[in-house]
């Protein structure tokens, strides 16, 4: 009889988290549709800082924030792309922009200049978007040392150090928002994208702990965990760049993601992705790891079969 009760408890525990996740999914989808949009400028401040802003999700978020009335600090490494994005934003919206050139792969040496450039600005929102992925899916032992350091400095170091720079002023004025871009890949280890997936679970845990530390500070600390969005970061796979309801274009994703800021603290940012997340959570970890490994092994084969030509 005791064994029977033990088995019941085990079954309950196995089913409880998926059940809670499903309820949370329904709640988040309803909330994202029916909660009124927040005036981000009024709630957080005049300026938004976006890292990795010249392509992909970062660029789309910069434009969407400008549409909502915020001035934009654009931080990236390519000056010509920065100037083009700055010009396009100022032509589109009645806002100011500020350009800061920084190569986040360089690590510690770049942050002193960024700190000086940001010193006199009323920063309301920090979007830690900058990130890189492998050139293509590969075994960890194949990764060049330089690529390993670049990924650590960009995917982990940038969000950590940028948060350190803006947090004190946000705390002192008791308002602000920090948005960290993680990924749906945080859910499980991903063979052939080992270090990338590990960097995304770091961002998720970093954000969660930060939110608890500063829960009474008046600061919104959000983790965005998108699944696939049609961007150049997935250049190694034509399949991952095809736009559909599960793989939105960057503008669609940015619009929906910003609607969740100040409403949901840990979210995919896009309701079809939340459904994907819920379905994934129903599966045991070993199945998720197996499926992810098979997918990326196939992406690797497809890429190498094409002669490793870059996809524009």
Locate predicted features.
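Active-site helix of classical SDR
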Residues: 163, 199
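Conserved glycine-rich cofactor-binding loop
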Residues: 47, 54-55
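Residue(s) in the substrate-gating loop at a strand-loop-helix junction
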Residues: 183
């Amino acid at each position: 009889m005791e064994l029977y009760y033990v088995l019941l408890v085990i079954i309950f525990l196995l089913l409880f988290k998926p059940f809670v996740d499903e309820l949370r999914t329904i709640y988040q989808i309803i909330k994202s549709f029916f909660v009124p949009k927040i005036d981000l400028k009024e709630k957080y401040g005049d300026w938004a800082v976006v890292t990795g802003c010249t392509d992909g999700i970062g660029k789309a978020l910069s434009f969407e924030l400008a549409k909502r009335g915020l001035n934009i600090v654009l931080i990236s490494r390519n000056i010509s792309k920065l100037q083009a994005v700055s010009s396009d934003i100022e032509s589109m919206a009645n806002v100011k922009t500020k350009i800061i050139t920084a190569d986040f792969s360089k690590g510690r040496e770049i942050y002193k200049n960024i700190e000086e450039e940001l010193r006199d600005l009323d920063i309301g929102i920090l979007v830690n978007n900058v990130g890189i992925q492998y050139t293509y899916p590969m075994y960890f032992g194949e990764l060049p040392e330089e690529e390993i350091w670049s990924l650590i400095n960009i995917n982990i170091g940038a969000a950590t150090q940028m948060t350190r720079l803006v947090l004190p002023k946000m705390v002192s004025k008791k308002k602000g928002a920090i948005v960290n871009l993680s990924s749906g890949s945080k859910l499980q280890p991903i063979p052939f994208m080992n270090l990338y997936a590990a960097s995304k679970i770091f961002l998720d845990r970093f954000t969660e702990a930060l939110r608890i530390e500063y829960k009474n500070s008046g600061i919104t600390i959000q983790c965005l965990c998108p699944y696939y969005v049609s961007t150049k970061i997935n250049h190694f796979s034509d399949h991952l760049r095809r736009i559909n309801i599960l793989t939105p274009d960057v503008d669609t994703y940015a619009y929906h993601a910003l609607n969740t800021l100040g409403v949901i603290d840990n979210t995919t940012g896009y309701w079809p992705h939340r459904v994907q997340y819920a379905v994934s959570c129903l599966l045991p970890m070993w199945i998720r790891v197996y499926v992810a490994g098979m997918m990326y092994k196939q992406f690797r084969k497809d890429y190498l079969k094409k002669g490793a030509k870059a996809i524009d």
